[in-house]
């Protein structure tokens, strides 16, 4: 999927924050100001977003794992929906400290969640008293909200896509410690430091958030399809060679 300048304008990607909240490190991406609001230069944003999409396509074609992160109210549902559509892990409620740097402990919580879910599904919960059964159900809800989106992740991601790097500063810091590249939407009030693929843009508008998340999800699917097509092509070429060899004999 390719995104156009018009689509970005319609989604309000160019609207930054109030000028008094600006981060000077975002100066290269700012076009100017209007009514005390910074206007982001979409001539900078569009090629940078395309670079990010190209990277995601390549990573996905090589079977890389991309974690979607967006826990602010406007992003939660969109992040979950687009990540699920692309078959990617996601965090959309709250970033728990150590989610990456202490993944061993997180894996234990995931194990507990899957065990409790199995108990609920096969009716094993019924052997407990009402109060205890309710406790299990509440624990499942709590775990599902915080780590449900990463229970199939299996290991650390190869890259992280983040909406609002300021709001998700914990995720950016942990990714930097582990050398995991960050693809981040950076508004005019935040710093692009520590972000490998900067997408300068509005991080508050749900339309803009949808545009970024849909683009990344599409790139994941395109990369995966490219990988499958290459495998099929390679397999058919091998068969063709074998047929030729048999014919030669």
From Swiss-Prot:
This is Small ribosomal subunit protein uS2. The keyword Transport does not apply. Belongs to the universal ribosomal protein uS2 family. The keyword Ribosomal protein applies. GO terms for molecular function: structural constituent of ribosome. One of its GO terms (biological process) is translation. One of its GO terms (cellular component) is cytosolic small ribosomal subunit. Keywords: Ribonucleoprotein, Ribosomal protein. PANTHER family: 30S RIBOSOMAL PROTEIN S2 PROKARYOTIC AND ORGANELLAR, SMALL RIBOSOMAL SUBUNIT PROTEIN US2M. The lineage of its organism: Bacteria, Pseudomonadati, Pseudomonadota, Betaproteobacteria, Nitrosomonadales. It comes from the Bacteria. It comes from Methylobacillus flagellatus (strain ATCC 51484 / DSM 6875 / VKM B-1610 / KT).
